[in-house]
Amino acid sequence: MRTLLIPAVLLALLMACGGGQSGGVPAGAPPSGPATQPNGSLHGRRPFPADNPWNTDISSAAVDPDSATLLAGIGLGTGLHPDFGTVWAGAPNGIPYVLVSAAQPKVPISFDYADESDPGPYPIPADAPVEGGAAGSGDRHVLVLDLDHWKLYETWNASTANGGASWHAGSGAVFDLGSDALRPAGWTSADAAGLPVFPGLVRYDEVVEQGSIQHALRFTVQHTRKAYVAPARHWASADPSPALPPMGMRVRLKAATAIGGYPAHVQVILRALKQYGMFVADNGSSWYLSGAPDARWDDGELAALVGIKGSDFEVVAMSGVVAGP
């Protein structure tokens, strides 16, 4: 569930939006391959530079002094839930994405929140997978990764009424995957936190093909604070309570948490949560871990994640929290 609340006062100095950068194709980027690849493999390539917050090892970072209070506000006894898998309610379960090449035509797109969106056109295929299915409700994310230009195009509440000749969405954001640039301060994205969605997904190609996730993940909580902390750029709450997590808060699985008894593929996810953690990225059910759908997932294996409870996490120390008025 996504709620858009625009801060009343934006920071005076805005950082450049990722959509305005052009870093070209980084060395080692995977070949574009077929014209479009729904939920395709990146063959080990990692979005964003090595020093990007998404790619930073926080296993030894300090614990936030308010960690216990913040985790209690989310739910200490609630289990981690895989918000992805094979099929749910007749549609692929998770947030899908599609890989495209430079040959993919760009099409016009309009937005409900155009003042906080990167303008089109976007290279969205006519048959791009939509979260929840073409006729589904919900967040309806459409994520497109241009492998040749190494750019990410993300939309929320996306739809097309003319077979893909043009699209309409709640908002849209473009990220240069060779840059560390953030959204302008106070801006949303296709995510309530103003973050990119794709880098935080649990993906089949990493878990099974690569056997390693080398970046942070994303999750949702039911109640967030009217505040955000970098790399997030936007809040989506009217509640200023310091007991609630701000958007962008990062948690990690405690180093002492025993994971040896979990299925091997689940252990890949849990190791990433120890080393890179996960960001509060949206409002929704608490401790719901985001991922991409794939018919090859073993839903029974993924269900084992529920054995990890909120009390098994700790909040990574935060600084520079931006609070709403």
Question: How does the language model describe each region?
Answer:
Residues 14-16:
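C-terminal motif of bacterial Sec signal peptides marking the signal peptidase cleavage site
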Residues 1-4:
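Positively charged n-region of N-terminal signal peptides that target proteins for export
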